Swiss-Prot record:
Belongs to the Lgt family. The gene is lgt. HAMAP family: Lgt. It comes from the Bacteria. This is Phosphatidylglycerol--prolipoprotein diacylglyceryl transferase. The chain crosses the membrane at residues 10-30, 56-76, 92-112, 120-140, 174-194, 202-222, 237-257. It comes from Pseudomonas fluorescens (strain ATCC BAA-477 / NRRL B-23932 / Pf-5). Catalyzes the transfer of the diacylglyceryl group from phosphatidylglycerol to the sulfhydryl group of the N-terminal cysteine of a prolipoprotein, the first step in the formation of mature lipoproteins.
Length: 269
């Protein structure tokens, strides 16, 4: 069994102001995505300035934050937030939905593209390889918060999470680290290498949706579902898996369309 590193969720406290690691992970993810996007900016559109890139990253980041929070409220715990709406704003306590954030990013991409003469999939293909940076950083934030841990296990890398998080004090799968490895590291490598060469429009977006959906679906088997939802069916199906099914099918559909439709301008990522 591996020891769980005791890390204070508050990274810095200045008087009443508290800066949480969870929030810092979002900033690190957004900053890392911007740096990587700036490296490929000339390949995407030589006429774009760093300022325009920053504008795009800003609006997509707003889509992640607002969509992620609203997605969690709608998909995972609607009744609790209806009973106490002020809880919606307590984002430092966790409670973000990837699928909600993904919808938020798509809406931001559509809106920004309409105003900058870019199609929806041109922007999505460009940003997709950068998204795993934010996903990986977010999973580290989950780990520091000692949330979203896995089922009990006797594997040698099991961890006992703090009593405030897991009163049962059982050795568990560190499922946040599994997701960091798959959604952050593995997905980044797949998309970064795949997009090094020009690909048909929609291909990179399809790869992102497909592999994220697969990775998340797999990890959900060892991750404990949200207590207020539990399993939706068969004592194993979770809300996360249900939301991943359309991503997997949509990803396959996008890849098929990208390579079988009439020839179109290739997207150089």
């Amino acid at each position: 069994m591996l020891p769980y590193p005791q890390i204070d969720p508050v990274a810095l406290a200045i008087g009443p102001l508290k800066i949480h690691w969870y929030g810092l992970m979002y900033l690190i993810g957004i900053g890392g995505a911007w740096l990587l996007a700036s490296r490929r900016l000339n390949r995407f559109d030589p006429t774009w300035s760093k300022e325009k890139l920053s504008d795009m990253v800003f609006w997509m980041s707003m889509g992640v934050i607002v969509g992620g929070r609203l997605g969690y409220v709608l998909f995972y715990d609607l009744s609790a937030y209806l009973a106490n709406p002020t809880l919606i704003f307590e984002v430092w306590k966790g409670g973000m939905s990837f699928h909600g954030g993904f919808i938020g990013v798509m809406l931001a991409a559509w809106w920004f593209g309409k105003r900058n003469n870019k199609t929806f999939f041109e922007l999505m293909d460009f940003v997709a390889p950068m998204v795993p940076i934010g996903l990986g950083a977010g999973r580290i934030g989950n780990f520091i918060n000692a949330e979203l841990w896995g089922k009990p296990t006797d594997l040698p890398w099991a961890m006992v999470f703090p009593p405030f998080s897991d009163p049962a004090q059982l050795p568990r799968h560190p499922s946040q680290l599994y997701q960091f490895a798959l959604e952050g590291v593995a997905l980044f490598l797949i998309l970064w290498l795949f997009s090094r060469k020009p690909r048909p429009t929609m291909a990179v977006s399809g790869m992102f949706a497909l592999f994220y959906g697969i990775f998340r679906f797999i990890v959900e088997f060892v991750r404990v579902p949200d207590a207020q939802l539990g399993y939706l069916a068969w004592n194993w199906l979770t809300m996360g898996q249900v939301l991943c099914v359309p991503m997997i099918l949509g990803g396959l559909g996008l890849i098929w369309l990208a390579y079988h439709r009439a020839p179109a301008k290739s997207a150089a990522q």
